[in-house]
A protein has these predicted regions:
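Anionic ligand-binding catalytic core segments
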Residues: 119-122, 127-177, 221, 225-285
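Active-site loop/lid in soluble adenylation, ligation, and acyl-transfer enzymes
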Residues: 1-150, 262-290
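A long amphipathic alpha-helix within ATP-dependent nucleotide-binding catalytic cores
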Residues: 171-205
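Intrinsically disordered, low-complexity acidic/polar segments
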Residues: 35, 114-115, 216, 230-232
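Conserved metal-phosphate-binding beta-hairpin within the catalytic cores
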Residues: 105, 204-225
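Surface-exposed helix-capping loop/turn segments at secondary-structure junctions
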Residues: 63-68, 192-204, 217, 286-290
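Coil-to-beta-strand transition motifs
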Residues: 23, 98-100, 200-204, 216-219
Length: 290
């Protein structure tokens, strides 16, 4: 008997979202995006790394904030998802009303934050100490929110005050409260997970979280969590400020694209090295192999 095909209700750069009545099913594909563009390559096992890594962190941090994960076992999902292509990379989730802010936290100065700091000594309106070098650890993690871009557009960094206004427009009377909670949850999550990662030989330089509201108006952690797609992971062994660091994430692919003037198809060698980095990070952090 054939199984009725289900079409996604939303396709993001990397994920597909399926309607499942009161819940959603989020499938992490093997697509890869850089600079807000979906590349032509498929990176085998990448979707499984993203889903299983998120599960690991969601389980670890539910004492700080509830999250949207219900199950990553396809047996808990409709029959359509009990195909091999969905096994390991699919997550049954609670429905949330997602808040329109990307919650970025930076523990080290790198990437776009470093570029802005070199110009004016600040990041997203936050004054930082003088004389920092690239990849330096910051005295305290900083919260630097951004807007959420549509596919093909770029996210825009905003100040904390702008995030209050942005949320107030969507949720009158709640802007300040929500903005403060997003900031506090983001920093608490980062601190707990960065401390843990360091014991496994990985520096989490920065990451982003996304949050939504449940049916009772409570803030819940959604989307993905501390994956190589949403974070910069550096090997702690050999960490040396003053320049960019080797990494366990898609920085490897980004660097190749920068050097090759946005040719949106990676050579197979770069694809293979990218998934090797993802798998290494997963194994170091979780102690498990995929």
């Amino acid at each position: 008997m054939s199984v009725t095909e289900i079409k996604p209700i939303k396709e993001g750069k990397v994920r597909e979202i399926y309607d499942n009545g009161d819940t959603l099913i989020m499938v992490a594909t093997d697509r890869i995006s850089c600079f807000d563009v979906i590349l032509k390559n498929i990176v085998s096992k990448k979707g499984t790394v993203l889903t299983q890594m998120s599960k690991f962190w969601f389980d670890m941090t539910k004492d700080i904030i509830p999250n949207h994960m219900i199950s990553v076992d396809v047996k808990d999902m409709p029959e359509f998802f009990q195909q091999e292509k969905f096994d390991g990379n699919s997550m049954l989730c609670r429905r949330l009303n997602m808040l329109p802010i990307e919650c970025i936290v930076r523990g080290y100065i790198t990437g776009s934050g470093w570029a802005i700091y070199k110009e004016n000594g600040t990041v997203c309106g936050i004054k930082l100490p003088e004389g920092l070098q690239e990849s330096d650890k910051l005295p305290e993690p900083i919260y630097t929110p951004s807007t959420k871009a549509e596919i093909g557009d770029h996210d825009e960094n905003i100040s904390f005050e702008q995030s209050v206004d942005y949320l107030e427009k969507r949720f009158p009377g709640k802007g300040q409260e929500y903005a403060e909670k997003l900031r506090d949850y983001t920093i608490a999550l980062y601190k707990k997970c960065a401390d843990y990662a360091l014991t496994k030989g990985i520096i989490i330089a920065d990451t982003k979280f996304e949050f939504g509201l449940d049916e009772n108006g409570n803030i819940v952690l959604g989307d993905e969590m501390l994956t190589p797609d949403s974070s910069r992971f550096w090997p702690a062994d050999g960490y040396e400020p003053g320049h960019g660091q080797p990494s366990f994430d898609k920085q490897f692919a980004r660097d190749w694209l920068k050097a090759n003037e946005h040719d949106w198809e990676l050579p197979q060698e770069i694809v293979d090295k990218t998934i090797d980095k993802y798998l290494q990070a997963y194994e170091l952090l979780t102690g498990k192999k995929l």
